Amino acid sequence: MAKKEVKKIVLAYSGGLDTSIILKWLKNEYGCEVVTFSADLGQGDELEPVREKAFKTGADKVYIDDLREEFVRDFVYPMFRANAIYEGSYLLGTSIARPLIAKRQMEIAKIEGCDAVSHGATGKGNDQVRFELAYYHFNPGITVVAPWREWKLNSRQALINYAKRNDIPIPITKKRPWSSDRNLLHISFEGGILEDTWLEPPENMFVLTKAPEKAPNKPQYIEIEFEKGNAVAVDGVRMSPAELLAHLNTIGGEHGIGRVDLLENRSVGMKSRGVYETPGGTILREAHMAVEQITMDREVMHLRDSLIPRYAEMIYNGYWFSPEREMMQCMIDESQKTVNGVARLKLYKGHCRTVGRKSESDSLFNLDFATFEKDQVYNQADAEGFIKLNSLRLRIRSLMLANKNK
């Protein structure tokens, strides 16, 4: 669709430097109505000035929607039922937020009669893929305006100069030369000084977590209860999904838990450094795996675990709404029907460690069979036949090699 044919755009708007400039640029270049949409996913005070700033920058209408409960209940929790983790470190805090933002953005586009949608993701990053795959899932014919792939503002300084010319406040400063993205699951930091892969992130960058060495000298023990793979209570107090994750963020942050610094492989092919704070998510994943240990069948767990790298890649690469992810989610959720129990964790100076787990209804730990003391139900002599049968292929191969070398 040509620029002159676009009549109304809904922009995913954070109020930061990039989307503020995009809002003004859309008004200047497309000359159309622009509706902004900001999702409250737990950013805190960041959203307070967004409405006023959007109108001042030229928005015709502003949506700010509280999606915190939906975010944790329908996106974070399903992902955590899978124990999803990308490249061994990343708990996918940004990746899992984009499908929900895009979903609501497309709903607003329909309500407002918009013929195009826009986002602030760069042409080098993952988010452009995540947003647009979701857009096309909901409306295969939607027009997507991606300014970073159109304009000539191809450097941070060019953006700043454009902002100054158009009287757009610039939130980035020399004191904090990096960009960040926050929601209830994590805060991510990238760019700026973090592009030096040898440089340790400065302590004043972190928001949610204390430095582990400055965390309390006394460990804290907590208990997290699960029903069908979902956390429902902390220390006996039942909470909604968003409340529970926020509570774990506070506790984990106090003990310096959940800092990650990694070079990840982006979906477009390059490597990029990301620094993350995920205190509540780190605790939640550890607790979930602890309850699974006592309630999940071995073969079910191993089969599920073998698929999780692929599942995590789907989320990272923007395929949340794909049929393969939905199919795999059905399998994962089936495996979680027996994941009912309580995990006991010890939090201390950046570490989160399981120290106990129990399940009144679904425990597969049977002391009569597992004990190292004298037992009446397990005949240890039976192990001989089991071992001989399982070693058969190894013994046959050994005989073959011996004959071959004669």
Curated annotation (Swiss-Prot):
| Top-level class of the enzyme under EC nomenclature | ligase
The metabolic or biological pathway listed in the UniProt record of this protein is: Amino-acid biosynthesis; L-arginine biosynthesis; L-arginine from L-ornithine and carbamoyl phosphate: step 2/3
EC number of this enzyme:
6.3.4.5
Domain of life (superkingdom):
Bacteria
Q: Where is the signal peptide?
A: none
- Binding positions for L-citrulline per the UniProt entry: 90, 95, 126, 130, 179, 188, 264, 276
Predominant location:
cytoplasm
HAMAP family named among the record's database cross-references: Arg_succ_synth_type1
Which NCBIfam families does its entry note? argG, PRK00509.1
In Swiss-Prot or TrEMBL terms, this protein is called Argininosuccinate synthase
Q: Which organism is it from?
A: Citrifermentans bemidjiense (strain ATCC BAA-1014 / DSM 16622 / JCM 12645 / Bem)
